[in-house]
């Protein structure tokens, strides 16, 4: 997902009075915005917030996730494409830790008899 994937028909707000009331206009704009967001997020499996050593914070959108031969295979999108390569090992580590934790919890449950 990147900014070029979205079709943004943004309304130019006119200062002149409209036939629709303020509340109706707000509701319509909210619904249009919600539709755009849902469309952009329909392929997102998980959102992760990562804070790098330099203090910068990045929202990562995981769009593909597989476990092949003991390794995580994934794809993700970020708003700052210039830092995607820098974020990749952090995203992979985060996903791997989550999967390992889930496998460990599942394995522990198999050995409980009550």
Swiss-Prot record:
Q: For the region Disordered, what residue ranges are annotated?
A: 1-26
The scientific name of the source species is Enterobacteria phage T4 (Bacteriophage T4)
Q: Where is the composition biased (Acidic residues)?
A: 1-14
Tell me which InterPro entries the record gives.
Phage_T4_Gp40
Q: Name one Pfam family in it.
A: Phage_head_chap
Name of the protein this chain belongs to: Head formation protein
Which purpose does this protein serve, as stated in its record? Helps head vertex assembly.
Superkingdom is Viruses
């Amino acid at each position: 997902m990147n900014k070029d994937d979205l079709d943004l028909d943004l309304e130019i707000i006119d200062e002149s009075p409209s036939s629709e009331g303020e509340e109706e206009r707000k509701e319509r704009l909210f619904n249009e915005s919600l539709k755009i967001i849902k469309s952009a997020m329909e392929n997102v499996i998980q959102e992760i917030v990562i804070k790098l050593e330099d203090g910068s914070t990045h929202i990562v959108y995981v769009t593909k996730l597989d476990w092949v031969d003991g390794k995580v295979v994934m794809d993700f999108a970020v708003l700052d494409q210039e830092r995607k390569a820098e974020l990749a090992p952090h995203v992979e580590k985060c996903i791997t830790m989550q999967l390992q934790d889930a496998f460990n919890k599942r394995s522990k449950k198999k050995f409980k008899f009550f």
